[in-house]
Amino acid sequence: MRFLFSILFIVGITFISNESFNQPQYKLHIISTTTPKYTLIFKNNILIGDSQTPFIAKWSTNATLLNKVGSESSLWKGGQGLNWLKLAVTNYKLDTLIQSVTFCIGTNGRFSSKDDIIGLVNITKERFPNAYLYVVQGSWGWGGNVNVTKEVVDAYYKRFNGLGVEVINPPIGKCEPHNVNLPQYKEIAKNLDTLISAQK
């Protein structure tokens, strides 16, 4: 009788153990076949500046906005000039993961010789110490910039270049810029992507 009881006890333990073992296997199978419903985007190459900034981001495959909504924390906002951007970057936290920063700035300040380009570049290097720096040339010939000449624009961005910032061609140019489908936005984005792809 004791022998029979021992056999039944062992069989019962084995059955319970198998049931306990199989249950997690079933759950694990369900988890492993579940497809994630999100895409992880690394924002390591960022565009910052004024209202023309998202138009370049639209066509770029390598560069993106920190946030689609313009604000100080997003480092871009419509109607803003270089000195606003310098303050926004100053208030931004240190980020060593950013690989490149592209400025799209100058238009709203009418490419003023008084803009503190040195200050903007220096604080950007402090906040993003591992980043390559690029700049997009703005637009003129419209609104408050109707009398601005290409010579003024060239001189403005030459100041960036003198500080080690790569100037991207072509400029947005002499046009009303608030049209995402302007061909120059596509060309600028393509040339920017080429530069980013060559980063080491």
List each language-model region with its residue ranges.
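Conserved SGNH/GDSL esterase-like catalytic core that processes O-acyl groups on lipids
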Residues: 39-117, 142-144, 149
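A cross-domain feature marking catalytic cores of carbohydrate-active enzymes
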Residues: 105, 135-137
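Substrate-gating cap/lid alpha-helix
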Residues: 140-199
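Residues at the C-termini of beta-strands that transition into short coil/loop
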Residues: 67-72, 137, 168-171
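N-terminal secretory targeting modules
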Residues: 1-48, 53-58, 199-200
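Generic structural signal for well-ordered alpha-helices
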Residues: 117-122, 153, 157
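N-terminal cationic-hydrophobic initiation segments that often serve targeting/anchoring roles
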Residues: 93, 124-126, 161
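A short helix->loop->beta-strand "cap" motif at the edges of active sites that frequently abuts
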Residues: 128-132
